[in-house]
Amino acid sequence: MAEITAKLVKELREKSGAGVMDAKKALVETDGDIEKAIELLREKGMAKAAKKADRVAAEGLTGVYVNGNVAAVIEVNAETDFVAKNAQFVELVNTTAKVIAEGKPANNEEALALIMPSGETLEAAYVSATATIGEKISFRRFALIEKTDAQHFGAYQHNGGRIGVISVVEDGDEALAKQLSMHIAAMKPTVLSYKELDEQFVKDELAQLNHVIDQDNESRAMVNKPALPHLKYGSKAQLTDDVIAQAEADIKAELAAEGKPEKIWDKIIPGKMDRFMLDNTKVDQAYTLLAQVYIMDDSKTVEAYLESVNASVVEFARFEVGEGIEKAANDFEAEVAATMAAALNN
């Protein structure tokens, strides 16, 4: 039997990422053959990964990488926040983002077939990572954005990489694009414009807003405060020419009833119409980037600010770790017990 030296164990660990004991056992089983040991570790890793396949991985990191006129934002999941801070995990995320940006896959299936620097497919690299790190590690999703030479990327990550954003700005500069991505990270828009919102979605969100008003009115009634009116509209898409004309007519009637001279109406009506638009586009403000108040200049919406600097936003992508994943709510004792059981089974 070949002698299993510390040097041999170290070499195998460097090539496979395996722990000391796993590397030593693999070398013993393969009589010191490095290549056979790597294959054995890979097979064992696949078995371990299979055991972990049904676990929920809702923690993790986003990765952002810009490659010339192509940018990628990705999400990679782990089971715990602790592992998400692991150096090997962070390197895997960053490498994956680079491979995605350079490979430009059309979907997750193509992404998983891309070749990593290690020579493995992306899919195999994640199986290996699951075995080595000891938690389910999964590549969840990616977005690719392309720009022209005249456009600018804004790449930004927030909260230690839990949020990743890419935006594209036309006729601005990289600094503006970066600021816009910071806004997107903080304010969570889901689409660019009200034109992208589904009609039924707007109706449902408006109903929810009015439900909140009803709850607020119950509290106001208890302290003899006047009730707040329901919102009639939630999006600019609902504000037809007839609706806007009627709103202006109502304002004029109100001014006449108050005895305001007609000669000053032109100074009052624009402000009241702005208020009408603000009050009746609450859904837009929550979900569309252009309608949101810009965090870098709260006197303007994003759309108004971009117009003031003769720029426009073309596209954006925002990923936040764990969006849409249902995470099991285990108590601490159950979590410890599960961890110990997993350790015994590995």
Swiss-Prot record:
Residues 80-83 are annotated as: Involved in Mg(2+) ion dislocation from EF-Tu. The gene is tsf. It comes from Streptococcus pneumoniae (strain Hungary19A-6). The lineage of its organism: Bacteria, Bacillati, Bacillota, Bacilli, Lactobacillales. This is Elongation factor Ts. The keyword Oxidoreductase does not apply. Associates with the EF-Tu.GDP complex and induces the exchange of GDP to GTP. It remains bound to the aminoacyl-tRNA.EF-Tu.GTP complex up to the GTP hydrolysis stage on the ribosome. Keywords: Cytoplasm, Elongation factor, Protein biosynthesis. Pfam families: EF_TS. Signal peptide: none annotated. GO terms for molecular function: translation elongation factor activity. GO terms for cellular component: cytoplasm. InterPro entries: EF-Ts_dimer_sf, Transl_elong_EFTs/EF1B, Transl_elong_EFTs/EF1B_dimer, Transl_elong_Ts_CS, UBA-like_sf. It is found in: Cytoplasm. Belongs to the EF-Ts family. It comes from the Bacteria. NCBIfam families: tsf. The keyword Signal does not apply.
